Amino acid sequence: MRCPFCAAEETKVVDSRLAADGYQIRRRRECTSCKERFTTFESAELVVPYVIKNNGNRVPFDANKLRVSLSRALEKRPVSADDLEKAISKIIIQLQSTGEREVPSKLVGSLAMDALKQLDKVAYIRFASVYLSFDDIEEFTKEIEKLRE
């Protein structure tokens, strides 16, 4: 692997261990030329299915779009960035494990809601209000009652 500091082609692995989510290997590398150290992450490359939107369009799954949506719901909530990334990784793994080449956007939304329900109930309600298109306070109340059960 090329050194990101001096572009030398030879680096050596100094340390290797499983990353926190268990699906990646974290490696500390050292450049044999400039002696700088850097971290790399190695993971299996699995195909994430296309998403079939409500209008019938098919688009590639965009993890960043999911990250932005969940981050917006979690704004000013006591949830760490690490917990958010773990939730996103879990959603991606669930999508990959369907074995399907295409999944409906409703599945992605449902998985996102399940993840938020586990992370933070307030963020879940925020996300649900947009995702489920709440029209009035009654719909909010019904969803909150479901959470209490």
Swiss-Prot record:
Domain of life the protein comes from: Bacteria
Keyword Transmembrane helix: no
Gene Ontology MF terms in the entry: ATP binding; DNA binding; zinc ion binding
Alphabetized InterPro entries for the sequence: ATP-cone_dom, NrdR-like_N, RNR_NrdR-like
Chain intervals annotated as zinc finger (unnamed): 3-34
Pfam family of the protein (one): ATP-cone
Biological process per Gene Ontology, one example term: negative regulation of DNA-templated transcription
Cofactor: Zn(2+)
Co-factor: note: Binds 1 zinc ion.
Domain ATP-cone as annotated: residue spans: 49-139
Keywords in alphabetical order: ATP-binding, DNA-binding, Metal-binding, Nucleotide-binding, Repressor, Transcription, Transcription regulation, Zinc, Zinc-finger
PANTHER family the UniProt entry points to: TRANSCRIPTIONAL REPRESSOR NRDR
Similarity remark: Belongs to the NrdR family.
Chain's role: Negatively regulates transcription of bacterial ribonucleotide reductase nrd genes and operons by binding to NrdR-boxes.
Name of protein: Transcriptional repressor NrdR
Gene: nrdR
